[in-house]
Curated annotation (Swiss-Prot):
Origin: domain of life: Bacteria
SUPFAM superfamilies in the cross-refs: Eukaryotic type KH-domain (KH-domain type I), Nucleic acid-binding proteins, Ribonuclease PH domain 2-like, Ribosomal protein S5 domain 2-like
Provenance organism: Thioalkalivibrio sulfidiphilus (strain HL-EbGR7)
Protein name: Polyribonucleotide nucleotidyltransferase
Enzyme class: transferase
Any single GO CC term annotated in Swiss-Prot or TrEMBL for this entry: cytosol
Swiss-Prot/TrEMBL catalytic activity: RNA(n+1) + phosphate = RNA(n) + a ribonucleoside 5'-diphosphate
Amino acid sequence: MTAIKKSFQYGQHTVTFETGEIARQASGAVLVNMADTVVLVTAVGLKDVAQGRDFFPLTVNYQERTYAAGRIPGGFFKREGRPTEKETLTSRLIDRPIRPLFPKGFMNEVQVIATVMSMNPEVDPDVPAMLGASAALALSGLPFKGPIGAARVGYLNGAYVLNPSMSELKHSDLDLVVAGTEKAVLMVESEAKLLSEEVMLGAVMYGHEQMQAAIKVINELAAEAGKPAWDWVAPEENVALKEAVAAACEAELTAAYQIAEKQARNQQVNALRDAVVAKLATGEEGAPSAEKVKGAFGALEKRIVRSRVLKGEPRIDGRDTRTVRPITVKTGVLPRTHGSALFTRGETQAIVVATLGTDRDAQLIEAIEGERRERFMLHYNFPPFCTGETGMVGSPKRREIGHGRLAKRGVQAVMPGEAECPYVLRVVSEITESNGSSSMASVCGTSLALMDAGVPLKAPVAGIAMGLIKEGDAFAVISDILGDEDHLGDMDFKVAGSKDGVSALQMDIKIDGITREIMEKALAQAKEGRLHILEKMNAVLSEPRTEVSAYAPRFTTLKIHPDKIRDVIGKGGATIRALTEETGTSIDISDDGTVKIASVDKAAGDEARRRIEELTADVEVGRIYEGRVVKIMDFGAFVTILPGRDGLVHISQISEERVESVSDRLTEGDLVKVKVLEVDKQGRIRLSMKEVG
């Protein structure tokens, strides 16, 4: 049982791959250590294939164990539960660059599991997990056309930083993860503070250049410890079947792909597919199966759509490569919400709603590195009706979580700080129609809904999805892709940003050989499209509303001395509870004495403020107060002049005339005006009624 180790320097960290000792029954297993963040990644491929399967069943599961950070999970069961948002997003991040590297026709089940076992809070486990997945697959003998490398790139003080620490990322203008093979970039996921297209492309190329060190070491590890390659052979292409399908329907299918309206087009394509299957898959000996006929029909669809674009002919819906679909924008579409927008681009439509909340509405996130509170949430819903289908409705799927995070990345750079916007914000994007690029419609709708809610965004933002069709050296970059173009194309390239720069870039490439020239063209064309969309949005709403909705909470903020916090809270929280119940407000007090009062009704907020000021006010010597007599004694009367502050009016200070008995002049409950004569060192207050007059 000999462990084989390989190490290399990767930015400021040393990365070590170890195999041969742990998880030896997996097809491939690697323990990756990057500066004490340790991830065990396994890959298992099954040799048997289910009969009739026509897809590649790859699953990737990334899971974080709380013991990795020396913590015990919360909750009743004290064990990890369903995947967190971070785990779901990282699973997608690993899946996206490895999926296109399995050969066409490979239908064997493959599962990759990455388990975080030790966590250095300065090193995010996502890059080690991606490197581990690449190494495990390279060792497994599976027909994987890798390995891939992965790198995180930051941008600090005008310079790129390889694999920055979590502390450095807080000050970085860029957080970009790039993955690719030795020759080509396959995947980019990034968030930026409105950087130029040149800086973004430079970061992608820098990351690809630096990841070669990881690819080299993975190749060395596979050469030394890899399992024998599977004797899998790609199924032979059935040229006769392809020709038969083309002869049966090519002209009709070409005509169908000129129907601009999605549902009418789909009906025609489905009818043609059924007719061809019925004609060719007869069930007779030697006749092809229905699955094989459908596969050949799908290949014909792809060829027709792609060749039209490469020849410069109109796209499916009649557009050229640069034109964006017609856009309509409406704001304030839902009367009782705090901010709303309806964004429609062709057959893609989103109703986006913004809600303004208080500090107590912030999301408590129990991450592996500890708890934190999230003040801005963006949720994306993709119901089945948006594509004219039926289906399950319930908790969000991986895709919905991924699209929601991408839309959030798109607007994060223009979000105001807490000082400019004291609200906790939740945005929900309801996709009501979908024909490509619904995540970018969510970016546009979010920008509009937040401005409609009166949130002071630094600038409006918009997003656009680009596509690519490439055959040999010929290629065409297409703007604002349809769902069919996404499915049949070679690249999905989403860019969000303001007029001044890029806020998010997501790229998934299905083929080798995407050059810098192609990416430059795609970014330039995306900018052109983004500026066009912003122009349409700005024509309806170009800056935030000056007033928040009448139904949104209004904030009143005041500062009290930290020593006075206990006076506002009261014994067991009784005072603050009474305050919130009696005024109908929500009150949050920070340790530094900042008090935030939230109320939908302005008068209620003013009343709560007045009462807090009374509770925390200092008694001023020489000032006249109106107070209530609370206790009569032989020697005088106690009067409450401020909440919780009583003073004594001595019998000699009640009147200029001689007073025989206090009760002759005062009774409990009387309202009287008194002047403060003295506050002694023990805080006792001496009052006078006769000094008032």
